[in-house]
């Protein structure tokens, strides 16, 4: 991983190392004292069901109810120290489904959801999660490292 020249190379190396160290069993086992896996599992099932049933009003309510950056303690640092890449599969699946539902709400012309109501939802999301910022400190002595960080973020479209 130390010799990777791009995020993709680093990611591939990290995932390979996780496989060699048999980290997949930890990732696949949803149970943990660190986070509320029952809450996330139930919400994941609910979001999928509402989207599949095209229940726009229900999906809207469910998304608004879940506007917490640390829902079920899924942001606990201990969940991100076990593997070189990623965390519990349940958390990854939940985040992916929330993004999918938000894309669905954003990209579709939904009769039950006016543009104003959509805008309110996304404004509330902005208030809950804020705007990401990148602070590069350390002056010229760390400038070379900063260039690498910025390059990797740029290559990932971030």
Give the ranges of each region predicted by the language model:
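Patatin-like phospholipase
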Residues: 1-158
């Amino acid at each position: 991983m130390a010799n990777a020249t791009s995020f993709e190379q680093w990611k591939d190396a990290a995932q390979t190392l996780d496989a060699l160290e048999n980290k997949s069993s930890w990732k696949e086992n949803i149970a943990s004292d660190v986070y509320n896996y029952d809450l996330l599992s139930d919400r994941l099932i609910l979001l999928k069901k509402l989207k599949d049933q095209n229940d726009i009003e229900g999906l809207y309510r469910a998304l608004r109810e879940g506007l917490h950056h640390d829902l079920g303690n899924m942001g606990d640092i201990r969940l991100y120290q076990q593997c070189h890449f990623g965390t519990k599969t349940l958390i990854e699946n939940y985040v992916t489904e929330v993004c999918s539902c938000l894309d669905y709400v954003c990209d579709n012309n939904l009769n039950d959801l006016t543009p104003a109501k959509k805008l309110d939802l996304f404004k509330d999301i902005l208030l809950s999660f804020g705007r990401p910022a990148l602070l590069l400190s350390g002056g010229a002595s760390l400038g070379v490292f900063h260039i690498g960080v910025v390059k990797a973020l740029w290559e990932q479209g971030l």
